[in-house]
Amino acid sequence: MEYFQVLLPLAIILVISKIFGKICVRIGIPQVIGLIAAGILVSVVEYIPGPMQDFFASGSPALTGLGFFAKIGVVLIMFNAGLDINVKQIKSVGLPATIITLAGVFVPMILGFIAACLIRNGTMIGLTHDQYFTNLFYGVIMTATSVSVTVATLQELGKLTSKVGTTVVTAAILDDIVGIIVLSVVIGMSGKEGGEAENPWIVLLKTVLFFIAAFLVGWLARKIFAAVERNFPHHRLLPVMSVALCFFFAYAAEKVFGVADITGAFVAGMVLSSNPEANYIERRSEIMGYMMFTPVFFANIAIANKFSLPDMNMLIFGLVFVVVALLGKVIGCGGTALLCKYSKKDSFRVGIGMMARAEVALVCAQKGVDAGLIHADIMPFIILLIVVSSLVTPILLKASYKEDKKKIDMAAAAVLAENAAKKKEN
């Protein structure tokens, strides 16, 4: 492939992605939706006769090149997700937040698995190996959480540091970690990424060994980074070395331990998240990612998967998938919060707060498509899930606090009236 063949499609994708992304931010929906919409628009070029048609045809050199950019993009997305992890907060996590996290991962996963079995296969008994792991992976996709919308809403309401706010933020951090581990284990057990299915215990052992090796290497890396930081404070050398560590972890995870490359990237971010310059590293790596690789990943979801109208079975399953994914978090997190002695209102708020999804759900789904575990037909419904959850979450959260706000306003009005009466008496 001549390298220049990818340059024109790349330029088109970057410009259209940025425009669509900004439009989505302006109207209050996640930027990733705009990036995917840009990919859908660009993918239509394949069907329009003209000089651009060959660039976006299936199997074209340009699409192959874009695929490589997309894979780097997904690694950087997960690296930044790992950098967002607050390790100190994890250490201070209480039992309720831990239980809520585990329920928030496994309840949606089990419900998703059951729904997939019943709708796609009509039964949960006598499934083949491939059917079992395909259905299980649909459940795994439901485990992902993105609380950026929730955090913004709670901040607006002045409730971010409340019991609900602290629980949601902490549970979301743990949710990411547990979800990524589950993803790696399921892909490894399925045998879809390069060979025969492995014994579950072997997969778990490899995953544990990877985490041990990663944190040992990470400990050494932190020492080196600290020395670099002392001699070159706020220098670009630090983010460059950080991204290099991310790529090394992603490679080692996939090649040496048989763990998903995105897990390696995520752990690299976690390892560096406690670095005093973590925010600086994250800003720089995000700039690098969102300048080129990340928009290509989201646009490539639409271009490579060739979205088309689903058949009736897929339509029914897709809509059920969205509903189960939404309710799974509310039931799993909200129900468990209730068992942990949270009030009914606070339990509902925790469930709603954990309901939102974003780019990590797309990353997990694309990993399943690439591994041959699931069909690309599910992707439009994951996009629908992101849109619906991003719009519904702030509405329901604000509604749940409406009565509290009324009581505060009434109490404030009563105090003002009392003060006014005292002034008149004087």
Q: How would you describe each model-predicted region?
A:
Residues 1-426:
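Transmembrane helical cores of multi-pass secondary ion antiporters/exchangers
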